[in-house]
């Protein structure tokens, strides 16, 4: 390394290291995860207990990963290949099984994107209309709409009409393909199959990406573009022939531009590659010529790809004079936690032009920044970072909310019993971040290799970008493979430390491990009261049509409207909750809500007064006198009847089902069929504990056994040479 390159590597490792340390603190002190286990935001003792469990669990996960790595080291080259195939198969099965276990109702942007692509594929429309309420504001999803359109059109042409499932399978293949591409890229990048196999192992151990496969959106569809760029970049490093340089450079050019159109964050790894290429070729004439040739090919192909993409976009998109400018997202990111702000969106949606929105956004940016002190700005950025990067689940459960079919397995993945899986993901996520710190420490100390900069710069780019952009927890998904790759290499940097020959050092490691493992079990035992004795209200969704796109049903009470929704259920429930919006300025309204079973028998009925009910709950809730147990997939009829008043306090909503049928059933308003379904949820609520005492003690016993196996595995004398694999 030159002095400048060495300085740059140290600078990157220090800056990224500080950001990762901040992430580690927010991973440990994650209130949301703590509430999954305590259900009591005011119980400081129980929350501190959960924080301690996450911290110790993360450390134990690091040690457990070292034990698994040691087992992988024993395999021959053929054994590594077989294990890699098995791991890819497990990853693929988990990803695809998720879309069948959780065929969620599309929500938010995913709904708009798929709905529009299906309309185009079926020939209902042939353009992306800039006058549309959604695409008039956002043109950044045009590329994914067109990709899905061509895909859907091909399947529709051969007679496949269930295009929603086509999208889910395609999304699953994108996730699987990205992981496979990363595997081959790491083989090329490091020259060691064992490293790539360990990457696959960690990818399988963290289920967050696989469980996001039902969410058909750019965050997952862009992942194979990142993986492809990484693989081609690794090929370029090893390339010795002009043909290889041309092919890989051209592919990078295409993937960078198309990937950027799908989701702009794809460009980070391309920019990181250019920066690393500069350092790689610095003061080396032969490498400099190779880099210049590669960049020239990449630039020519990228420019051509950009013009082609621009032409396709102009062909299909009519344009809009009310698109949200970049400043809108920056201004939104400075408010609150930096999350999506519905009120701010509505404010700009009401404006007349992009120029007006841009001026208002710039004004808000200046005013907000002026209102911050350095301390409050730091707190704001810390909250943003915590929201996006501090949860090991990457918020997959937020994309599994909309369901029209209940399976008991749902409870443990995304339902009320998901707390243990969330804790597991959190501990593993903490372990990954700890291993990234090790990776960065090695980068800081290393004076010979510049390869490690590629992933570090990419991740740093993502972290910095989302400091100035709107954040959502799911937006971290495209970077999970990069985080796992860095964690894998960090783990390899320290795994041999657990098998050093010096007796005193081995005793030190043994003592430290036994202490942490024992303390972890002790904390689990001390948590028995909160897990197995403290009562909580468990709310299990059986049907949930809340997250999809809303249409208003106005004046239900004032005009004596009758809403009638049929639906099907096959498991116990005792409560209904409606997606409705309260209007405090209209306090006088009454509604009669009736639920009948398949035999037309009334099983729940109540007349609601706004003053009596809505002021307390801010929502409409129908409780059954007792739990109802349906026969197999029984049909129910839900009726909401307005009783007449001067105005409506409550505004009911229904989901637009012109292309995507959210619920099996039918909605009628005053006897007229509506192309949609009422937005409501069917639930079973009960007072219970988080986990029964026998189940919790069994879990603790399994963890103790795993700790013992890790101890036996790690502290053997034999070590394995990895240099040739």
PLM feature spans:
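Transmembrane-helix motifs of polytopic, lipid-linked glycan transferases
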Residues: 169-190, 228, 434-442
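Membrane-interface anchor segments at the N-terminal boundary of transmembrane helices
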Residues: 43-55, 166, 384-455, 683-700
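Multi-pass, polyprenyl lipid-linked donor-dependent membrane glycosyltransferases
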Residues: 167-174, 198-233, 259-269, 475-480
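Start-transfer (signal-anchor) and selected internal transmembrane alpha helices
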Residues: 1-97, 289-300, 512, 516, ...
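Membrane-proximal lumenal/periplasmic loop motifs of glycosylation machinery
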Residues: 100-108, 124-146, 168
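Short hydrophobic/aromatic helix or loop-helix immediately within or flanking a transmembrane segment
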Residues: 115-118, 133-160
């Amino acid at each position: 390394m030159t002095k400048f390159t060495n300085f740059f590597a140290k600078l990157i490792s220090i800056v990224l290291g500080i950001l990762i340390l901040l992430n580690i603190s927010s991973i440990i002190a994650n209130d949301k995860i703590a509430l999954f286990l305590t259900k009591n935001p005011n119980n400081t003792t129980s929350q501190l207990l959960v924080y301690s469990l996450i911290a110790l669990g993360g450390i134990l996960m690091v040690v457990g990963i070292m034990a698994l790595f040691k087992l992988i080291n024993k395999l021959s080259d053929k054994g590594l290949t077989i294990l890699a195939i098995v791991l890819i198969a497990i990853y693929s099965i988990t990803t695809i099984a998720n879309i069948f276990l959780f065929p969620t109702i599309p929500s938010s942007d995913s709904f708009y994107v798929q709905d529009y692509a299906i309309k185009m594929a079926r020939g209902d429309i042939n353009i992306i209309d800039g006058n549309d309420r959604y695409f008039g504001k956002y043109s950044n999803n045009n590329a994914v709409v067109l990709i899905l359109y061509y895909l859907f059109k091909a399947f529709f042409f051969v007679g496949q009409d269930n295009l929603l499932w086509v999208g889910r399978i395609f999304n699953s293949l994108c996730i699987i393909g990205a992981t496979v591409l990363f595997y081959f890229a790491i083989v090329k990048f490091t020259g060691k199959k064992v490293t790539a196999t360990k990457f696959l192992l960690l990818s399988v151990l963290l289920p967050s990406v696989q469980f996001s496969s039902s969410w058909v959106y750019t965050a997952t569809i862009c992942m194979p573009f990142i993986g492809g760029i990484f693989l081609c970049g690794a090929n370029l490093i090893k390339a010795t022939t002009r043909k290889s340089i041309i092919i890989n450079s051209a592919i990078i050019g295409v993937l960078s531009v198309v990937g950027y159109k799908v989701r702009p964050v794809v460009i980070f790894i391309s920019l990181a590659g250019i920066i690393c290429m500069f350092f790689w070729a610095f003061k080396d004439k032969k490498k400099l010529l190779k880099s210049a040739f590669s960049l020239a090919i990449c630039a020519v192909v990228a420019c051509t790809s950009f013009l082609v993409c621009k032409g396709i976009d102009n062909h299909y998109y009519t344009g809009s004079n009310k698109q949200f400018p970049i400043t809108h997202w920056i201004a939104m990111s400075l408010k609150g936690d930096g999350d999506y702000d519905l009120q701010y969106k509505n404010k700009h949606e009401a404006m007349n032009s992009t120029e007006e929105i841009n001026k208002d956004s710039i004004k808000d940016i200046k005013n907000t920044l002026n209102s911050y002190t350095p301390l409050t700005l730091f707190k704001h950025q810390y909250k943003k970072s915590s929201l996006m990067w501090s949860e090991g689940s990457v918020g997959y459960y937020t994309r599994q909310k909309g369901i029209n079919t209940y399976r008991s397995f749902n409870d443990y993945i995304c339902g009320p019993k998901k707390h243990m899986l969330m804790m597991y993901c959190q501990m593993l996520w903490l372990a990954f971040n700890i291993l990234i710190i090790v990776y960065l420490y090695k980068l800081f100390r290393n004076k010979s290799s510049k390869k490690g900069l590629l992933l570090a710069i990419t991740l740093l780019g993502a972290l910095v970008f989302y400091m100035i952009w709107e954040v959502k927890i799911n937006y971290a998904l495209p970077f999970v493979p990069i985080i796992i790759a860095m964690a894998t290499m960090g783990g390899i940097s320290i795994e041999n430390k657990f098998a050093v020959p010096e007796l005193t050092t081995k005793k030190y490691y043994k003592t430290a491990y036994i202490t942490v493992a024992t303390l972890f079990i002790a904390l689990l035992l001390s948590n028995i009261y909160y897990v197995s004795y403290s009562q909580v209200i468990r709310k299990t969704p059986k049907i949930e049509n809340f997250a999809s796109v809303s249409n208003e049903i106005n004046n239900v009470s004032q005009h004596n409207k009758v809403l009638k929704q049929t639906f099907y259920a096959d498991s116990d429930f005792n409560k209904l909750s409606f997606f409705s919006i309260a209007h405090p300025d209209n306090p006088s309204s009454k509604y009669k809500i009736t639920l009948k079973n398949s035999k037309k028998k009334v099983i729940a009925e109540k007349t609601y007064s706004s003053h009596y009910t809505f002021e307390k709950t801010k929502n409409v809730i129908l409780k059954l006198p007792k739990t109802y147990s349906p026969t197999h997939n029984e049909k129910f009829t839900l009726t909401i009847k307005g009783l007449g008043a001067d105005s409506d306090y409550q505004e009911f909503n229904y989901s637009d089902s012109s292309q995507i049928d959210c619920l099996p059933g039918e909605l009628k308003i005053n006897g007229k069929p509506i192309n949609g379904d009422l937005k409501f949820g069917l639930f079973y609520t009960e007072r219970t504990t988080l986990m029964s005492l026998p189940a919790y003690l069994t879990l603790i016993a399994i963890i103790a056994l795993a700790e013992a196996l890790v101890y036996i595995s790690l502290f053997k004398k034999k070590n394995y040479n990895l240099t040739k694999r």
